[in-house]
């Protein structure tokens, strides 16, 4: 009976995956010890989503929010509250992971984590229609690497630090 139950469970999970019910966000574990490994998984989710037609299978900046440091999480929460108040799009009007709104990723290169004590940086280079560079700044909190800031280094307004943008935004509008 157990074998039948296990087979039924496996079949259900497989069909849910085929239907796009299992969201991409759940697939990038926040427990990865190396921040570069985690970032590779995040960008792989975007690659997979390009091939998926399911809206439930689309990655989002929520992947970063789940792994944000306490200070960055507070800034993300402030921005989310602004959106929830019906003010439309607030500080973040694009997906900073891919440095755009639409994406066609190629040549994704996640560099190694450069660790100095309880801080680390990881540089990600990729093409999203044009060449892009994002630098992720991590801090160790509660024994885990957390994203403390992201700096997009491409485009006419570069560099753009996400933490600074969230801090400086006029939420009274």
Predicted features, each with a name:
Residues 15-24:
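C-terminal segment of classical bacterial N-terminal signal peptides
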Residues 1-11, 15:
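Bacterial N-terminal signal peptides that target proteins for export
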Residues 35-39, 60, 68, 162:
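Stable alpha-helical elements in mature extracytoplasmic
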Residues 25-29:
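Boundary of Sec targeting at the N-terminus
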């Amino acid at each position: 009976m157990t074998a039948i139950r296990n087979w039924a469970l496996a079949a259900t999970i497989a069909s849910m995956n085929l239907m796009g019910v299992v969201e991409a966000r759940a697939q990038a574990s926040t427990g990865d010890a190396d921040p570069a490994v985690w970032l590779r998984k995040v960008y792989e989710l975007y690659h997979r989503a390009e091939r998926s037609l399911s809206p439930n299978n689309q990655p989002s900046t929520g992947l970063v929010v789940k792994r944000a440091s306490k200070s960055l999480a507070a800034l993300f929460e402030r921005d989310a509250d602004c959106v929830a108040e019906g003010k439309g799009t607030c500080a973040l009007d694009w997906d900073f992971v891919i440095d755009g709104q639409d994406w066609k990723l190629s040549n994704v290169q996640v560099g190694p984590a450069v660790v100095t004590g309880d801080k680390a940086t990881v540089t990600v280079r990729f093409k999203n229609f044009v060449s892009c560079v994002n630098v992720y700044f991590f801090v160790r909190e509660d024994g885990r690497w957390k994203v403390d800031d992201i700096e997009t280094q491409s485009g006419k307004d570069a560099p753009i630090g996400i933490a600074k943008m969230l801090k400086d935004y006029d939420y009274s509008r």
